[in-house]
Structures are given as C-alpha cells and as structure tokens.
Amino acid sequence: AIVMALKRISESHEFLSSHKITRVLKNMGDITVRSSLIDYCYKISETLLPKQSKFLNQIDLTKNIFYTTSRGVAESNIIVSQQLSPILESVFEGETCIEKTNDLSAISIKLPTENVTIPGIYYFIFQRLSWEGVNINEVISTSNEFTILMNEDSVLSLIHI
C-alpha cells in the first residue's frame, strides 16, 4: 500500500512538473538568432580582466554586434561577432588562447521570470535538442534568458524544432 501511494504521488508530481514546464515554454519571449560568431577561450590571468575592460571600451559605441562572456575557474570565454575579431585579437595579444572556434551561430531565448522556480525546464529543452541531433558548443545564461552556441550548419535544424 505504501509503495502504491508513493507511486501515485510520484506520478502526480511528474504531471504537475511537466504541466508547469509546458506552460513556461508556451510563454517564451523573443528568440534572437545571430550568425558569423567566433568563440575565444582564454586562460585566466592577472591581465585578462583589464584587457576585457579595454576591449569593451573600444567597442562601446559599435552598433549591431554580438558580445558575451563567461568566466570559469581556469578559463574565460568571449564570444563576439566576426567583425570584432581583429580588435579582440589585438587587445588580447599576449594572453594564452586555449581555443578559437569560427563559424558559429547563437540562438538567444527569453524565458518568463517564473522559469527559475520550476525544475526541469533546461533539461526538457536540452533533451529535445539532443533527440534531434543538435550539437551544442556552449550555453550561456542569465536568470531569464539563455544563449545556445552552435555551428552555423546546426542552427537551421534547431529553428525547425
């Protein structure tokens, strides 16, 4: 009897969770697609942040560009529009570039604010992408939006999902 009761609770919880996820996904906001991006991965150093600041000052007034960054414990990624590549490489000269990946696209998706209180949203999205054979190079997120970085060839298949 206890096992059956636990099973009913589990099924009920599963239904409520998937219902909440579906509701959030139906209320997704804007989806923005950007192409011709380059992903730079640099080793963390004492001079990396000052160089990022210098780079941001140089591109501050540039219109219609893509720029995002994320910092881990040992490395920092900077993703930029291809047109910014010469400026970035000049400013970051002397830094250790671990990897550079060209020909990338990004899809940025805005989620409703309640997404942070509902477990499983990202799992649901990434599971579906995996089933469709979409390879994700990187994911960068804020509280209410996330950006999926992938090869430009993959972006068309993602849009059709």
Predicted regions and their residues:
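Regulatory modules associated with amino-acid/nitrogen control
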Residues: 1-111, 115-117
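Short glycine/threonine-rich loop-to-helix capping motif typified by GTGT followed
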Residues: 81-82, 148-156
